[in-house]
UniProtKB/Swiss-Prot annotation:
This is Photosystem II reaction center protein X. It is found in: Cellular thylakoid membrane. The gene is psbX. Gene3D superfamilies: Single helix bin. It is a single-pass membrane protein. The chain crosses the membrane at residues 8-28. PSII is composed of 1 copy each of membrane proteins PsbA, PsbB, PsbC, PsbD, PsbE, PsbF, PsbH, PsbI, PsbJ, PsbK, PsbL, PsbM, PsbT, PsbX, PsbY, PsbZ, Psb30/Ycf12, peripheral proteins PsbO, CyanoQ (PsbQ), PsbU, PsbV and a large number of cofactors. It forms dimeric complexes. The lineage of its organism: Bacteria, Bacillati, Cyanobacteriota, Cyanophyceae, Synechococcales. It comes from the Bacteria.
Length: 39
């Protein structure tokens, strides 16, 4: 694996983590608050 390819893969992984974790937290938070609001 070339250093360029390695850096590209790492940037994809880090970018995915930076996007996925807040999205997951937001979805869990919204689903919890929605549940309370509906009942």
């Amino acid at each position: 694996m070339t250093p360029t390819l390695s850096a590209f893969i790492w940037s994809l992984v880090l970018g995915g983590v930076i996007v996925v974790i807040p999205l997951t937290v937001a979805l869990i938070f919204i689903s919890q608050t929605d549940k309370v609001r509906r009942s």
